């Protein structure tokens, strides 16, 4: 139960937990930027001040739809304003996607997230291109 979970975290050490979460966040931000370039907007605080959370949007994609597509890929995230509407308003956005990895998550799972986001973005770009041109690719 809850008591055992607390004992488990105390055995690991909260400083170690925070260090690992920040490491996952740093790796995730780097990978998302490498994978999606200018198309990703990351709103998380810098990893040295964060708690491992990755908050982001992909330009042109609705956060709720993005979260739904990630769910279809077996990746759990949240979308919306996350009880932080004033923060979202100050960022000039209404909602975002949030991935909240913890000590049971791995670097490989962060890679899965980046790969899935690229796949979803590519599907969207192909669909958008098809709607605009009636063709699935520019050379067709």
Task: Go through the PLM ranges and name each one.
Residues 1-140:
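Pyridoxal 5′-phosphate
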């Amino acid at each position: 139960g809850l008591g055992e979970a607390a004992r488990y975290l105390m055995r690991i050490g909260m400083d170690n937990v925070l260090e690992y979460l920040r490491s996952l966040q740093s790796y995730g931000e780097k990978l998302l930027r490498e994978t999606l370039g200018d198309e990703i907007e990351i709103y998380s605080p810098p990893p040295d001040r964060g708690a491992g959370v990755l908050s982001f949007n992909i330009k042109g994609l609705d956060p709720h739809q993005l979260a739904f597509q990630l769910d279809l890929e077996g990746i759990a995230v949240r979308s919306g304003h996350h009880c932080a509407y004033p923060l979202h308003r100050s960022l000039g956005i209404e909602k975002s996607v949030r991935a909240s990895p913890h000590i049971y998550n791995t670097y490989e799972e962060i890679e899965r997230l980046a790969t899935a986001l690229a796949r979803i973005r590519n599907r969207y770009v192909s669909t958008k291109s098809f709607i605009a041109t009636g063709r699935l690719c520019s050379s067709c």
